[in-house]
Each structure stands twice: as C-alpha cells, then as structure tokens.
Amino acid sequence: MIEMGAPTMALDAGPWRAGVVLDFARSELFDRTFREGMELVEETAAYLDGPGRQESKLLNRHAALGYASESMRLTTRLMQVASWLLVQRAVREGDMEPQAACDARYRLAREALAARTEIDSRTVLPIGLSDLLVRSERLYERVMHLDRRMYVDVDETEQPHPVLSQMEKLQAAFGR
C-alpha cells in the first residue's frame, strides 16, 4: 500500500539517492516492470469482469467467500504496485523530482496487507484467479525488493564516499 501521511523522507534524499531513483526510472528494468505491471492490471480487470465473474457464480458459498476475499487482495496488491510504478514513471518523464519520489508516502506498505492469506483447504479457487494471484504476488515481491533497495534498506556503508563520487562525476564530465 502506498502509505499516506505527513511528508517525510524515507532516508537521505540527497543527490546520491535521487540519482539512484532517476537511474532506475530510466532503466530497461523499469520498462519491463512497468509493462508487466500494467499488463497484469489490465488482464486482471478483464478476468474479474468476464470469466472470473462467471466462474465465481459456480462456486459454493464458502468458496465464493474465498474468491471475493482473494480478488480484493489481488486488486489491492496490483493497485499498490501500479501506484508505485506510476511514481517512477513521473520521475522518468520529469513530472516529479527524484527527491520527491523519495518521500515515505510513496513507499509500498511494510506490512503484509497485500500478502495472500491462506484460504481454508476446502476452498478451491478457479485456475484463472489462482494464476493471477501467483503472478501478482511475484510482481509485488519484486517491486517491494526494488522499493527497499532504492529507498529504505541502504546501509550508510553502501553510500559512495563523497569525494570519490565527485571525482567520478568530474571524470565523466571531462574524460580520463
């Protein structure tokens, strides 16, 4: 879940972190993740409005309750991922400063709110929903990993030395 609240920075949103955010937003990894995320959102919407709706009508009451619960988790999980990806795209397109994207309100929730809850073993979910659940969980885990690496889980020892960082910039600007 994208956490809302008072604007606070996750960690130091200085030039180094902003550079990491901008580099990711411009990367092929972002392109692939964004494409996969948006395609999964569209596929899920089509499934839930079409075949999923029909399949849910064939379920017994207990299974239908499990279906409703898991489909809500699925849509919540995907909306969280889509929101995160849209923030990264806004950085890429210049609509948001990389430092602003470091704000804690744009992070994925640390709680397992979007995590799948085990359903009673008697509940058999339709294959289409089960497939979407597995794929959305994998995507969420990957985006959570990216979020933590880019914004939260950075040890001070991992940050580049300020002098070395400046030397690298000078070398890049003026060549070796």
Regions found by a protein language model. Give the residues of each.
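Surface-exposed peri-terminal alpha-helical interaction modules
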Residues: 2-176
